[in-house]
Amino acid sequence: MKRVFLWLIFVLAFHKLLAEKIGDIASVVGVRDNQLIGYGLVIGLNGTGDKSGSKFTMQSISNMLESVNVKISADDIKSKNVAAVMITASLPPFARQGDKIDIHISSIGDAKSIQGGTLVMTPLNAVDGNIYALAQGAIVSGNSNNLLSANIINGATIEREVSYDLFHKNAMTLSLKNPNFKNAIQVQNTLNKVFGNKVAIALDPKTIQITRPERFSMVEFLALVQEIPINYSAKNKIIVDEKSGTIVSGVDIMVHPVVVTSQDITLKITKDPLNDSKNTQDLDNNMSLDTAHNTLSSNGKNITIAGVVKALQKIGVSAKGMVSILQALKKSGAISAEMEIL
């Protein structure tokens, strides 16, 4: 026990040199959220609810009234103050009976707005068909741009718990959020160095099986494991939001020399110095841009995604055009990184 904590103190003292904690890059298999869903009614709407043409809404109103001993045919209901909605929620791990969770409500009929209404008691089911929570509450005006959906903070009460016996377990499995052979071995070796050999074994690039040392309970063991710093190798990734034009990438993602054409735009990327001084603009990091010939030079240095984006902005390329060029760079092999388009 003493050796473990001394090692942890030593590592944590140099945490600035390390990228992540194991708990940040890996999750415990089986310890996860469970999705809940339910169908219900929002009442008290000021004429903005579903119209009588929404047969399922009128039938639901009839069923609700019948449950309180009021019998009326769905065909006789003409109310516009009620809207049919779907309710979704996430049941967190280890949630206990009586705990509150947030819910999200969305209209499924032809209502104009559900703002200002009240969700009547609605059971929320999991995929196994069991009821795990009951939702109910007033809908407070939130997003003025979307009147047909809303959130209710603490809008549901947990009625059934997901049983999970963590205390008596001797072995668990860690799942890396981003599978990587190097990271899996790194986690394995780090845990074995801290707790002793054969505590951890990497089964594949994503999965590490860990066995609890006898001197710890599983809760204590996992608490220690999640706090251990580790050198984390992340894949290069570029995220592009085409609508807003936002581009997120690592600062050191390099772009190899290439000529790329997309739509009406041609961009030449080179390490050679530029000759046309009249049309050359100096950018950051020793880069230069020939605006007449759309040529970007790094003057012998490495060119990064950040430099390419800045050059495209100088040329006046639209957000959509930037996305096209970045995709073309990826396809040509000039970029060694994953790309995600939002």
From Swiss-Prot:
It is found in: Periplasm; Bacterial flagellum basal body. GO terms for molecular function: structural molecule activity. The keyword Signal applies. Pfam families: FlgI. Residues 1-15 form the signal peptide. One of its GO terms (biological process) is bacterial-type flagellum-dependent cell motility. It comes from the Bacteria. Keywords: Bacterial flagellum, Periplasm, Signal. GO terms for cellular component: bacterial-type flagellum basal body, distal rod, P ring; outer membrane-bounded periplasmic space. Assembles around the rod to form the L-ring and probably protects the motor/basal body from shearing forces during rotation. NCBIfam families: PRK05303.1. The basal body constitutes a major portion of the flagellar organelle and consists of four rings (L,P,S, and M) mounted on a central rod. Belongs to the FlgI family. This is Flagellar P-ring protein. It comes from Helicobacter pylori (strain ATCC 700392 / 26695).
